[in-house]
Amino acid sequence: MSAIFNFCAGPAMLPPAVMQKAQKELLNWNGQGVSVMEVSHRSKEFIALTEQAEADLRQLMDIPFNYHVLFMHGGGRGQFSAVVNNFLGNDGKALYLVDGSWSKAAVEEAEKLAGKDKIDTIDIVSTVQGKREVSIPDLTQIDKDYRYLHYCPNETVDGIEIFESINSPWPVIADMSSNILSRKIDVSQFGLIYAGAQKNIGPSGLSIVIVRDDMLVLPSLPQSSIMDYRLAVENDSMYNTPPTFAWYLAAEVFSWLKSVGGVCEMEKLNLEKAKRLYQCIDELDFYVSGVAKQNRSRMNVTFQLTNSELNSQFLEEAQVAGLVALKGHRSVGGMRASIYNAMPLEGVDTLVEFMQAFAAKHS
């Protein structure tokens, strides 16, 4: 069977080495004679797995000692509500920067839980010469006392990524569901980072939360116990039965990432993948990117065909060529190639060759 390259935005492809190992030990994990899905989450063998997973993630991201690492339920949307309930209390306010679909969704959830009067927003995307770009205002000039500032540094639907640091007088909370572990970041600049696992970490059903000590003293609202960060810390992410198979696969992804050189090497690869794909889009009049170069996502490359009548044919022929899940999000249309950490350079090169051939045939 010829190679299939999966460009799905999430759940996304996992490293083949991780999938092969999971397949090999599916029925007999760690010499136990049973699957990892069948062992107690409180067994010494599984506890050892969780401890190694946290240690590897701390090493990969250089997470300081005053941060807790939590493995939780709920995905990104679950964290939309958890952030509000854990930190706003009865009288807190928060500021949300909006740069695309997911940050808008976070605002909607926050307003539903806390009320619109407690949530302020700033739209940081504008269109300049037909391209969407990000402009972050001087936040130090805002004379308000917010519990936190929330933003999404990579918008999967819109293909927009923010690479600059946020200079905020309030604790910064970042939804890094789609770009965590894709490039080096300074964790100490954030009060909290959360990420749904299903793009760069593992399968859906798990979310990673990295939270600074001082955030946990903020007043909270009544909420579900399984989304309470304080209870999660006190119980080592095991207040209730966690998604053990997803945790296991996340641990294997962290191990794999270390084996290929860590985040620094992955960042170099991701830069090269994005460079080759955007270069193809820019060099051919057949395709167009609607995002300014400085804000083009390295993870989610969105583009349009100048002749939209060819969209269906493009997708059909791509499927035949082994290039799957290239259809853009229904809200924006066009195409989207998600090239997360697990996507090899070969997959991007194969896509570029297909795009060049398709353009030559239909120009």
UniProtKB/Swiss-Prot annotation:
Family statement drawn from the similarity comment of this UniProt entry: Belongs to the class-V pyridoxal-phosphate-dependent aminotransferase family. SerC subfamily.
One BP term from GO: pyridoxine biosynthetic process
Species of origin: Shewanella halifaxensis (strain HAW-EB4)
Protein name: Phosphoserine aminotransferase
Complexes and interactors: Homodimer.
One GO location term (cellular component): cytoplasm
Top EC group: transferase
Gene symbol of the encoding locus: serC
Pathway(s) the chain acts in: Amino-acid biosynthesis; L-serine biosynthesis; L-serine from 3-phospho-D-glycerate: step 2/3; Cofactor biosynthesis; pyridoxine 5'-phosphate biosynthesis; pyridoxine 5'-phosphate from D-erythrose 4-phosphate: step 3/5
